[in-house]
Regions:
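Active-site/substrate-binding loop(s) of hydrolase catalytic cores
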Residues: 1-60, 68, 90
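Active-site-adjacent mobile loop/cap segments within catalytic or ligand-binding domains
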Residues: 39-42, 48-50, 60-120
Length: 121
């Protein structure tokens, strides 16, 4: 479902998110979505290959999407966790596995390597 607004940043939720990203400048944006059951990634850095049982499967970057804005235009990595179902959360053990994998990836890619283009510490 892609229901774009009438113009870029015309929707209040988009305006809010844009302001937060512009002010805070996060090192990583994590988006939770459904229903593809994959891991998506946009932006700099080598992407995580998996989070829990979700495997990397880049679904593409769409103009106006969070991945396009954050990952392509702003250079902020965007990890999108695509759950299997919008109304059914994974079990606690699976959620823990996803977060553990994400934290390991962040430690290597964001903390040790630093921003893209910088030398490793």
């Amino acid at each position: 479902r892609r229901w774009p607004g009438t113009a870029p940043l015309s929707e209040p939720e988009s305006q809010f998110l844009h302001a937060q990203m512009d002010e805070f400048r996060p090192q990583l944006v994590v988006s939770i979505h459904a229903p593809y059951g994959v891991l998506d990634f946009d932006g700099p850095h080598e992407p995580p290959q998996r989070l829990g049982r979700l495997r990397l499967d880049r679904v593409g970057v769409f103009p106006g999407s969070l991945g396009h804005y954050g990952g392509v235009q702003q250079g902020m990595p965007v990890v999108t966790i695509e759950l299997d179902h919008a109304l059914r959360m994974p079990r606690d053990a699976e959620v823990r596995s996803m977060w553990d994998d994400l934290l390991r990836w962040m430690d290597v890619r964001l903390l040790k390597e630093g921003p893209p283009g910088q030398a490793k510490k």
